[in-house]
Amino acid sequence: KVDYTTGAVIARLEPDELLDANPEIAKQACISVIKLGNMWSDDMRPQHWNSILSACEDAFNSGSEGIVVCHGTDSMHFSSSAIAFGWSGNGGIPPGRIVFTGSQRSSDRGSSDSGENLLAAVHWAAYGPKVNGDIGDSTVVIMHETSADGTCAVLSGVGVRKMHTSKRD
């Protein structure tokens, strides 16, 4: 999100802002939101991954079938891998789908990919295939597949990396 006073991008987006900006999400699934924090993704550390793991476990124990983690793109690949490895550390698999998503462009820009990525992530979390423990299906990352709207890619959470700072594919 852009701070229009300074012109700088800030890490201050509230969950309700995401839902209000994307009302079609509520038509996809029953949504419950938990805010774990607002920070730059490159400030993520192992204790943050533990918090994400705990929140996922709590959500699954409360009956959630899928989870969407909204995350900055700079270190999303580290977090999606950490969560996948965290679940498999004891030879287990998550009881449902865990989807990471974000946006290459600020959510308040007209060219933002945040809405489409979030909608695709919610759809996958709600209706995607059952997690079976195959390599790479414990967590997935869903982002734009090309620079055009209309198609999102579903990628293994342990096999992704950021290729560009603002390009949408």
Please provide the spans of the model-predicted regions.
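Active-site histidine-anchored catalytic micro-motif
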Residues: K1-D169
